[in-house]
A protein has these predicted regions:
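Membrane-interface "cap" regions at the ends of multi-pass membrane proteins
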Residues: 1-58, 70-71, 75, 87, ...
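Helix-loop-helix junctions that connect adjacent transmembrane segments
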Residues: 16, 21, 60, 134, ...
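Extracellular loop-to-transmembrane helix junctions
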Residues: 43-133, 242-245, 251, 436-448
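Helix-loop-helix connectors at the membrane interface of multi-pass transporters/channels
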Residues: 91-97, 121-141, 227-231, 239-245, ...
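TM-loop-TM module centered on a large, flexible mid-protein loop between adjacent transmembrane helices
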Residues: 92-95, 99, 241-305, 324-371
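Membrane-helix boundary/coupling elements in multi-pass transport proteins
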Residues: 109-123, 220-227, 286-325, 368-369, ...
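Membrane-interface loop-to-helix entry segments
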Residues: 126, 137-187, 198-201, 216, ...
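A generic transmembrane alpha-helix motif of multi-pass inner-membrane proteins
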Residues: 177, 184, 370-378, 403-472
Length: 472
């Protein structure tokens, strides 16, 4: 029999009760869905190229620091996922731990993050297909969007099966390429620290932001918690494992390319928007490059599947709680079809419109930076959620006794440090990013506040109208 739960938000509105989705994802499925959301190989060829442009030979350091930032936030979200196992992820955490209004704003920003982050991978895939094979950019985007949308509409289980097969293949490709760079470098290794003086350290915050965009793909798993078997244990473990594996592999592979560049004396930091592809082709040949591109495009499909699924589950729960139109929470054959169709349309619209207006790599960078800023925003909200919950638990436990207090006390500095690190990188990234990306980011925040205010005013108006009717 299908396992179902009832999620009751803290609004006291009994009409908001809703049956959640069937739990059918095990640990392996969840890991590879989240790993697919990271898309390490495509991330290395796209986000990695952007980090290289900013940081040069310090790129592995920026990637490692980006992974550390994501890991801090990941530990916070892990603790929250142990407490909240229903659908919705970051939105659900803020909705229950902080307030309905903050939850709405967090869900609003998560939609911005997840749609733009997924569309960035569509743009990255389109760029690589155009760069290597000469395919028109819009055709390349459609080649990613159509199969990914089909998988999403088929359901989370078929998507997870595809993610497992594709993820194993990708792991083998990444490890093989790294070992190949080590072999070609004759097992010599360079020290990134010796290049600090020649690096553009003023762009370090932006380099960390882009570096963090690779492992931050783990954020696709939290919204699907309601479909994970034994979510209280599985989701948190998967988050940390995916961050370490995905971020570690990305830093390792970029280091391998940089190491080969240093040892061989062959620079590749000026090769347009695809230095890694160019360098790979130079050393491994065109046939191997085609294999790399195939794996990267497969990554684009994986990332789009993971984040389209995550976006639709967030919309589904927001509709169920009536902070967005309730129709978004309707189920058909056990799937949130309205939410899924809404997100699929958004992916097609954003990807194609941006690629019509901008060059593919520029579109990727724009979408990537804007989504990364939003990622920091929602993680600050998650950190605040854990901070408040931990303070409340400490207060309760001190009043009744000190048993099991140590782990809760440890959550407070964890949330504080993660918030400080995220806020610092957010501020410095805003100051160093291209202004138009920042304007779009803040415009979406303002739009969310306007929507929340309008909803609140209309809600009060409805209450007053009903009250007057009863008085009559």
């Amino acid at each position: 029999m299908d396992e179902r739960e009832v999620y009751v938000p803290q609004t006291g509105n009994t009409q908001a009760k809703t049956a959640l989705l069937r739990r059918q994802l095990n640990l392996r499925d969840t890991f590879f869905m989240s790993f697919g959301g990271q898309s390490p190989l495509l991330s290395i060829l796209t986000y990695g190229a952007a980090v290289l442009a900013f940081m040069g030979y310090l790129s592995p350091v920026a990637l490692a620091l980006g992974t550390l930032l994501v890991l801090l936030n990941g530990f916070v979200v892990q603790r929250l996922s142990n407490r909240f196992t229903s659908t919705g992820g970051y939105y659900t955490y803020a909705f229950n731990a902080l307030s309905q209004r903050v939850g709405l704003q967090t869900g609003w920003m998560y939609m911005f993050y997840s749609v733009l982050y997924g569309c960035a991978y569509v743009a990255g895939s389109a760029f690589l297909l155009n760069y290597v094979l000469g395919l028109p950019v819009l055709l390349g985007a459609v080649l990613v969007l159509v199969p990914s949308s089909t998988l999403v509409l088929l359901g989370v289980k078929p998507s997870s099966k595809y993610a497992v097969v594709a993820g194993v293949f990708e792991l083998l490709v990444i490890l093989s390429v790294f070992l190949g760079t080590v072999y070609l470098a004759h097992f010599h290794f360079y020290n990134p620290g010796s290049y600090v003086g020649g690096a553009n350290t003023s762009k370090l915050a932006l380099g960390i932001l882009l570096g963090a965009s690779i492992p931050t793909g783990y954020g696709s798993v939290a919204p699907v918690s309601g479909e994970v078997v034994d979510a209280e244990k599985v989701v948190g473990r998967v988050m940390i494992l995916v961050i370490v594996v995905g971020g570690g592999l990305a830093a390792l592979l970029v280091y391998g390319f940089m190491n080969l560049s240093v040892v061989s004396g062959t620079p590749f930091l000026t090769e347009g928007g695809a230095p890694i592809v160019h360098f790979f082709s130079h050393y491994f040949g065109y046939a191997a490059t085609l294999l790399l591109i195939f794996a990267a495009i497969n990554d684009g499909v994986l990332a789009t599947v993971a984040f389209t699924t995550a976006s639709s589950r967030t919309l589904f729960q927001m509709g169920a709680d009536r902070v967005l139109p309730h129709r978004l929470s309707s189920l058909r054959n056990g799937k949130p079809l309205n939410a899924m169709l809404t997100v699929v349309i958004a992916y097609f619209a954003v990807s194609l419109l941006v690629l019509v207006r901008l060059q593919a790599f520029t579109a990727f960078v724009a979408l990537g930076i804007a989504s990364a800023l939003a990622s920091l925003f929602i993680h600050i909200a998650a950190n605040a959620s854990l901070f408040r919950l931990s303070l409340k638990r400490v207060t309760r436990r001190v009043s009744v006794g000190l048993s099991d207090l140590t782990s809760t006390l440890g959550e407070i500095p964890l949330a504080f440090v993660a918030t400080a690190f995220s806020a610092l990188d957010l501020v410095y990234s805003v100051l160093s990013a291209v202004p138009i990306y920042v304007y779009i980011f803040f415009a979406w925040i303002i739009a969310g506040y306007i929507y929340a205010d309008a909803k609140e005013i209309l809600g009060e108006s409805d209450q007053n109208t009903h009250g007057e009717g009863r008085n009559e």
